[in-house]
């Protein structure tokens, strides 16, 4: 199957600056939804799908919009993996890896340790009266919890966080920066060594982890290693970034914060609205297996497309006042965790970690918590998006 390297007939060509997208992609996405919902973007080398309806359709038709994109950045970074498989091969890997991340397993196996990890991290900073909640809390919490669920007891939280940054930067390396590939290669080797050691240990002593589950489903070591790399990538940035974006929103909306503190059931709404408002994963690549018309454009077989989740989640035809953070908006399923057979495997882990533990603990424990407006906190990214830091102050005991 050949891969077209130019716009499909009838598709508008739109030049987008990647640096500007990293800074703030939403104005460009709004313009695309209005005037060019299926557009060829030369700087990305693919057609961008930016409307909710088209993205949802593509996610539900893997027989047309295949995850098995030839030469994808993810394949280059980690090798063959379940995110780039469809059909029986995807089901085989997902069935082996998913059980430890299901809601019941999260509650029964991991919730107690997650809570202890959150308390331990908060205890380290509680007496300081100031912190960067990303570097000092959200990222190490996501990393230590991920190591637990994966079974990587031979890796520290710092190891997992460093590996995740290397994987995610490479997965979004559309600029083809050689230094990015070098860091990813180093992380890849380290992950493979750690996984091989644990896989051997759990063969005789199962521990309920993802690696253990895959070993006892007779998945080959190389496949386990590749899929652990994938999970390490998304398993840190998604809970970290949802935590940071939602925390900052609440710090600037004390009325909402006070409501949620008084009615803890609302934390779930805060999570879903945060994931919609600033999606931690902004796009998914796909490749067409056959000619297909979508958004008024017939895309030929082989075409590479981007399902721009971050844009679909701001589609005004679906979400009224879509650019506004609003936990009271009428329920409509967002796209932040994907859909169809590729629905995010770690969604329930992230939901519990952030909405049941991290936010309630931070906002309940740190009195008079305020955003430090003098700090240079910024939001960045378009393939993946989140806060680089979140500096806060509070009244230390």
Q: Where are each of the predicted segments found?
A:
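Cytochrome P450
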Residues: 1-397
